[in-house]
């Protein structure tokens, strides 16, 4: 569907903002996606972007509806894995498993099939079938030494499933393999390895510590103000005493003057 030039430019600007913000500020990305959706709801790319923005903010029912709309418009199966993952998000892992067995999966490219395998394994874990999840992830793609964009996540998911099954030594090995493939920091495999080795992560700043120059708590500030006020009162009292002593000296001098006059 083609749009008038001005409208197309407005839609494009909003879609650019969705792509730019979806990782760092999903809620803001979602807001931009809603604007694009109001402007051009019959454009497949807009429905897809709205779906991913809703997915990023865990609005799974809304995301699923948008992905379905985009698929109806394009006929593409590309969104099939993320649609299945939305079913998981909605607490329906059995539907995700059913989707993993549909003919659409065979039409996916290699990356899409790996994504579907990850979703299916996640659904197995949702249903408490950890051993089945491990078997689901075992594949030629997992065994391959070649590194692709999906390799770190596949190895990480396998390591995580092994750890849940109590197979710690194997889990450590696969977290290590995930880390080797993860050049972009897509996973926290290094942290998981450290945890398995007994490393504890603590905040550099303790709960009772305050950074230098930190403002005092309200109660502490009030106490400081009260102390300052007491000092001021004491100073005032001392000034009053000095004034009284001064008055007495003046009176004494006055008496001396009066006495000399009388004399």
Predicted features by range, described:
Residues 20-21, 53, 84-86, 123, ...:
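Residue-level signature for tetratricopeptide repeat
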Residues 221-254:
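Long, acidic low-complexity intrinsically disordered regions
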Residues 22-24, 57, 90, 127, ...:
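Structural motif corresponding to the intra-repeat A-B loop/turn of tetratricopeptide repeats
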Residues 6-14, 29, 40-47, 74-82, ...:
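Generic helix N-cap/helix-start motif at coil->alpha-helix transitions
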Residues 1-6, 34-41, 68-75, 102-110, ...:
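Solenoid-like repeat scaffolds
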Residues 2-38, 49, 55:
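Alpha-helical segment of the N-proximal tetratricopeptide repeat
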Residues 17, 49-50, 83, 120, ...:
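Structural register within alpha-helical repeat arrays
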């Amino acid at each position: 569907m083609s749009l008038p030039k001005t409208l197309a430019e407005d839609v494009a600007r909003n879609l650019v903002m969705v792509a730019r913000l979806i990782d760092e500020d999903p809620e803001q990305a979602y807001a931009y996606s809603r604007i694009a959706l109001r402007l051009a709801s019959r454009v497949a790319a807009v429905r897809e972007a709205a779906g991913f923005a809703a997915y990023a903010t865990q609005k799974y029912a809304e995301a699923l509806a948008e992905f379905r709309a985009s698929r109806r418009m394009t006929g593409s199966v590309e969104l099939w894995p993320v649609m299945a993952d939305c079913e998981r998000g909605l607490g329906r892992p059995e539907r995700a498993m059913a989707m993993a067995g549909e003919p659409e999966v065979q039409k996916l490219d290699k990356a899409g099939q790996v994504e579907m395998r990850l979703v299916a394994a996640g659904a197995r874990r949702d249903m408490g079938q950890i051993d089945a999840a491990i078997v689901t992830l075992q594949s030629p793609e997992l065994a391959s030494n070649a590194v692709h964009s999906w390799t770190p996540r596949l190895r990480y998911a396998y390591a995580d499933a092994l750890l849940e099954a109590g197979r710690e030594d194997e889990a450590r090995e696969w977290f290590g393999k995930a880390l080797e493939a993860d050049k972009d920091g897509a996973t926290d495999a290094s942290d998981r390895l450290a945890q398995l080795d007994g490393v504890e992560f603590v905040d550099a700043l303790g709960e009772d510590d305050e950074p230098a120059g930190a403002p005092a708590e309200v109660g502490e500030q009030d106490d400081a103000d009260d102390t300052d006020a007491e000092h001021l009162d004491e100073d005032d009292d001392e000034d009053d005493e000095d004034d009284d002593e001064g008055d007495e000296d003046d009176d004494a001098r006055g008496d001396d003057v009066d006495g000399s006059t009388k004399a």
